[in-house]
Amino acid sequence: MAHIKLDTLDVVQRPGTTRRSNSNSGRSSACSSGSLSPVPIIPIIAISRDTDDSESESEIETEPARLFQRRMSIKCTNNLAAIIKEGFLLKHTWSFQRWRRRYFRLKRNVLFHAKDFQCDVLDEIDLSDLCYFECGIKNVNHSSQIITPTRSLVLCAESRREMEDWLGSLKTATTPQRPRGDSFLIEQHDILSNHHHWYATSHARPTYCNVCRDALSGVTSHGLSCEVCKCKVHKRCAAKSIANCKWTTLASVGKDIIEQADGSIIMPHQWMEGNLPVSSVCAVCKKTCGSVLRLQDWRCLWCRATVHVACRPQMAVACPIGPAKLSVVPPTSVHSISTDDAWDVASPKGNFSPLLVFVNSKSGDNQGVKFLRRFKQLLNPAQVFDLISTGPSLGLRLFRHFEMFRILVCSGDGSVGWVLSEIDRFNMHKQCQVAVMPLGTGNDLARVLGWGSSCDDDTHLPQILERYESASTKMLDRWSIMVFEKAIAVPKTPKMSITTEQEALLTGMVTSANHHLRFIVETNDTQTLISSTQSLCDTIDDLVGRISEHHREDEQLAVKCDILRQKLNMLLDALQEEEMGAHSGDDLIATIRSLIARSIPQTPGTSAPLLNPSISIEKNEKDEINTKERRSSRSLRSSEKEALQSRANSVKRAIYNVVEHSEPGRPKRYQRKLSITPFEALKLPTTASGDSTPCSSPLPIIPPINIISPTMETSRLTCISPLPDTRRDSVDESFFNSISLPAPRQFADSRRSSGVPDVIQEIEEGANGETVYRIGRMSLSGGANIDDAGNRLSPCSDGGENTPTERKVDFLRVPILTGEPIVDPLSDYRPIEVFERTYYMNRELDRGKEGTEEKKGDIEKEKSSGTDVEKEDNMPTEKQALVHICNLQVPGIVVTPNSQNVYTSASLTIIDTDAQTTNEQSSSEEIAGEASDVLSAISNEECSVASEIFDKQDAGHTLGDIIQSLDASNFTHIDSPETSDETEAMPGESIMDDISSVLGHDITYALQDNTLTDDTTTLCSEHVGPPKPPRKKSLSALTRGHSHPRRRNSSPPRIPRLARMDSDDNPQQFGFENIVFEIDNRCDDQKMREPPRYCSLAQFVEGNDIARQSFKQLMLEQHGSNDNDTEYPEQQTPTNTMTNLMATTSEDELSTQTAIKIEIQDVDATMVRNINSSMKANTILTTSTSPTKKSGHGQDISVVVRPPTPLRGDSVKPSGSLLLDGSGGAISMAMGCSSLLGVRAMNAEIRRHSSHAPGLAVREIDKDKDRRHSGFNPNLLTLDPEHARFLSSSPAASRRISCGSLFKKNQKIATKRGYGLFSVRFLVVAEPDIRLATLALIRPLIPLPNEALPNLQTLKGSKSSLFMGSTLFGFDQFAAGDKEKDEKGCKDKEKTPTEETGRKLPIINPLVRLPNWPNLANGGGFISKCLLANADTLCAAVSPLMDPDETLLAGYHEKCVMNNYFGIGIDAKISLDFHNKREEHPEKCRSRARNYMWYGVLGSKQLLQKTCKNLEQRVQLECDGQRIPLPELQGIVILNIPSFMGGTNFWGSSTKKDDIFLPPSFDDRVLEVVAVFGSVQMAASRLINLQHHRIAQCQSVQINILGDEEIPIQVDGEAWLQPPGMIRILHKNRVQMLCRNRSLELSLKSWQEKQRQHSISIQRDTSSTTSEHATSTDEVISERECYVLLNFIEAVSSLVKWVKFLIISHPALQHDLYAVACRASEALESIHPQGKLLEGPSLRTKLVEVIDSSRQLYDDACTLLRDRGHSLILREDLETKLSAALANMEMELKKCSVQKCIDGKLRAYFNVLAPNEEPDARRKSRPFWVRLRSGSTAGQQAFKPPLTNTREAANNWSVNEVVTWLETMQLSEYVDSFLKNDIRGKELITLGRRDLKDLGVVKVGHVKRILQAIKDLSEN
């Protein structure tokens, strides 16, 4: 229906405007055109037929709107001004208040709009006199209104940000052009100009326009108000208003500037006329000013003073600025803006602490806009910024020149982090202090800082600002979230997920095909082969049929299916060729032929041309391979099995191609290049994998079916970071696999792991014995290797050319093993796994299976098993199988058959060197045995040693040659001191580190062990030393008749080229350990000739781990060395020789094997110090009695606890001497001089037992030398698999001690203590990560009585306990007595919390190591008690990481900065879902209550879905370098503050005094790591103090995200999906935060109250009459004091009465209290003898005695009731009355004060004011002594005793008391009204809202305050 507008009778066409008519518009000329027409326009009524063209305002008003609308065609606008902004907005229309979506285009001074952007004609609005403003107070619909002289539009944007962008663009379009048009100048102009900022609002009282002075229209006085100065205008007058808004700078003050004579500028008042607040009082005459009838009187915008027009000249010129003077930046102090976009500030006189305010207008239940406006009204508008509009950068740039200032962030935690990040960018940490106002949802940081959980009311903002002014400062730690986003390919196991039946069937078929392929390749049974082949064909046919049925139109899938059939036919052809020889005419042949005929592709003609031509080539190659030889049996030779295996590989890959193509939504896990895998990988695993299940996924995962892949299902990352790996082993302990990060394969540092190189070398031996190096490249098809010439390389050396007694292999020639049939076939980088731990065990188990053949000593068996590698159990022909291995170009080492003196059990291998070998082995046979230890010691960390490092080694180089030559190699690591002559020598670096950085630490350790001889103490040099006397030969040398003394598997003899190394005189041949210390053991003059060499750090390139620059080629100049050795100080050690108690290999004793070495102290021995080499003595041998002597009661048993450590001892120094006697290997530990003895506890140790071994003394290292070496001791027992699950650890990389290392020098490391009948001595060697749980396993080994072991529950970390100390390195003065320890313990109490506990970081929860954590029983077992009682020792410090620098952080980038907490898993998933919900439906998340509700809903959703289940298998956690074993969890939270996700103390409060953890704080540079087991736990932590989920406290965290799936992560509530890679959390910096100081607030409040009372009393005294003034002296009690005195007498009398009654009714109580009550009663009687109060000065003197006695009575009564309240049973009425009497007495005593006057007498005075305006919350429940009672019925009741008899007292108030009461509430403006109406106490209590209105109290807030105060008086 058309709308008739009556306001358009006077149509005035603007001059100079031409109206165009467009005939194509289809509109009437009356509405659309202003041009002349034949029909004259009658300007009486205008009917608008298109209702959309008549706009309205937010309220229907009668303001004129022009009829004629100018329109323009866009076809003619090509030459007009550029478009400033365009887009769609909602436009408010008349019809039913609807919103229509319209297209708007903004140009300079013109706004166009149309229905769509494709319209040719647009409506034009002239913006020459523009006025725009917001339409809403709250941030609801983001609407704004545009008013011009001709038009009025109401527009709505989708968000406030978009609305402000449009308003800013309108401002830009209407402001004049500037020379610099950047955004900063525009924002700057907006700040510095005094333009008003309008918003539409209504008013509750008559309001007048400041432009036209008329009243605003409507009953609600609807109009526009400036959000800064509260200027009121009509909408039509807004464009006419002058720019006189609140000043911002000195330039904006203009002509009002007042300058003093000295040149200083005074801040003047800035007056705004009219519209004063209700009941405003003139600052001059103290009378009411303002009017509701007209615009009159003035108010100051800064100090908020009001003044009459007549009184204004009498007002002081200077403005005091107001209550927030300390925070306000006066505009007179801001002179200009300098060239760096910062203010030039002149600090005002007096106290000045400017406040910079950032408000997030979207936060706080959409109250941010209200706070933004309120802050602008209180402060300088240039101090307040909207984060949504301008961000933090503008404000920080402007405040850059302030020396110190405060920042107030009014928002949630996310905005606080944004501001802090900008502070980082501007580097302003030292000059700003940050406070937080909680406007967000969680507000965790505000809670911790003391600012509360929310702030919704802006009415008390001045009082809130005062709190921030009195705040104290604390430092907040900030942490960098460093991210290295790199896909880490980890084999995935079948995931536990909800799948459909079709997906489950598909997965089953793929798995079935995998198993059949395995049987085809491995089986020796013909029937099994036939059945497996037939089943395989049926399975593949069914699989192809089902997939093709669902993808009939997919041509690529059809091609892949044809390829699969082709591959299957090739496999069947291979089987047919295999069986043609031995089984011709068999049923097998017929079966295979039928299968081949059935498997022919149905469309060969169409699919063949589409196949890759390389397939036929590959087929021809494989046919040639397979047809070379025919088999005589199913037991295939290696080459034939290789061919058959290649066929199986092809079929498997074809299956995967089909499956992956049919599942486009599935993650492409298998699209990686293949690596060649040997036949050995086909063997089934000996043990099943663990019961671990990976994370669930919404997508079904087809189980990988690689039957040839070398990696396991449970492979873990152990080498992706320079942090040790102590991850919980959820699978069999035999396997420690690794997946490596991509790194340059030629230069893989030991801190990183690298995969198999693309180019490997095969070593083939010719007939002449020379080693031939052939560079080969891998065949991606799984077939043969092809060299550069295109010739096929044999998978192994030609067997015919090998000698029957030896076979040379490379010492790094590693067989690629598989542990599980279900693996990922397409991993990008293949690790080479050799499991040191199970090598010997499995070898002996294999021998045991072939027992009869082994006993016969078959020579052919020995030949076939020359490659002594780890084998699986279920391969019958593995002894004959030739192993295809990946060769690394290192000279070969000969492997021998198994030794007969090796005895192997489950986890212990004993090599008996006493065994007499009847058949002496040849030299080559002896050498052949060398590689077993080497092969077994190769770590999963570093197997891809580059061929370039060992390039051009001559043939015949043995392992020892390689090792010896590494020291003087031309290629060295950049970490080595040899690489640089300029850098400075770093302590703790050695050649061993350089070797280990190339070979890997595990290899290095094994090489050290293998090359260790009984001359280890000899120092080595590069030149041959002088002749030495012949050494005593070792047992192995004697028995074999070899002159080269050596241990088993030591270095073989050298070739003639290195003849000098072959002699006994060369010390360098004696092992690695000599090489390690060679540099420091040179003579002093040699050191002086050579400049010091220092280590430089390796260089890294992005995307890789180490660059080629990390290796240098050197030409070392050789120097002679002196024979003199550096002397080392001796250590005082008990002269006892300890015989080694060997553990047997029986099953019962094996089950009790632990990391504890038991030694029986038998006879005395002498410690041997090393003799100078010039004395020609290397060792001194000691003898002892026979080790077979049985221990009796007179012998001492020593138990050496050698727990495993994640450090492996490579970063600590040797601590003592190791003495091995000649008869039994008795070992004595000496206390170290520098640090811990690094013990590398291997998973399977080699125990050598020899009664003829010569003495071996490792001499002590110089204290001044900070050299590191591997203290690997092969003579230590290790853990069995049962306990190694949580006690073992496998380091991943080198650990370098930084300058901030926690290891200290000169600290003892071991101690002894005897227990029990056998005098057992527990020699505890302190390790950084000691596993004290092994102590529980001592009992099975030693028959100790119960009292022999200490009470571990009572050990509080004292140094007298078994584990010697609360700190790991605090073993000071072990010989000191208990008295000294007690004295030291007392001193510790005076230290800080950290020093008091003496704990070092990281502090790891000892229960984490337990397999069943966190599901521990309440009582706990013996192990748990050991762990908890000795947690200090367990959680002691470890070697920290090297100081973070660019080297360790290469490839990382800072994702964000953490201030509060970091979460990964379920909590981040909930936050991410909430964020997505809020972005999708912002209207549903506009209140804090709704947000909490959504969090609950999303958390409950996770309770059912569990999308983050089994997160422990997708992430790895490292705390300060220690790998943390993770239980089954759903999330990990890292806390910096003790508040998480809305106020939850997720760490839990510490209640125990002996808590092993430090109290959490946000300024201690310590992070708290906790586990999240589910949403139920997160909800329960809000109510219950949970602590069982604590993991650790540390200073750095690394999280490795495995796989290829993104994981949700949140930082301070901001969540996102993080790709796989590594995350490091490192300390970034600290920022000053303002914390609420309640004690200072109370002090200030009390001081201000006293000042107010003093001023009131002065005013009262001056206004009182002369007679009243004469009586109101200090000597005479005033009328008001007399009233208080009467109440005091009443309270004392009541208390005396009920105390006496209490004593009488309970005679058992003490009678002293009765005497005190009598004394108080007598003193009370003395002040009113005969019922009349004393008069004059004597009354005050007597009152002193009454106050003292009554206070003593009160204290004694409270003490009695507190002590006896639990057992005292009172009558209910007596308890109630006694409680009330005590409460009243407490209140009255607060009003009393005793002062000493000038004459020396004590006088009593009373406080006449009400002491409690806000009653204490504790008074509302029960008195404190009642609350202490338990079980009392009265104590359980909600008892509220009356504080005072306030209602009765208020009834007796006079007018003066009522006035005082008003003044205490800061309502002094109503004093005159109450005095005029004679309002006394009785009238005050009965006042209502209408009465207050009659008294002039019309302000709503004041009415509420007075009524509430009256209500409190009545209730009390």
Swiss-Prot record:
One of its GO terms (cellular component) is cytoplasm. Residues 350-486 form the DAGKc domain. It comes from the Eukaryota. Keywords: ATP-binding, Cytoplasm, Kinase, Metal-binding, Nucleotide-binding, Phosphoprotein, Repeat, Transferase, Zinc, Zinc-finger. The keyword NAD does not apply. It is an enzyme of class 2 (transferase). Residues 82-175 form the PH domain. Belongs to the eukaryotic diacylglycerol kinase family. This is Diacylglycerol kinase eta. It comes from Drosophila ananassae (Fruit fly).
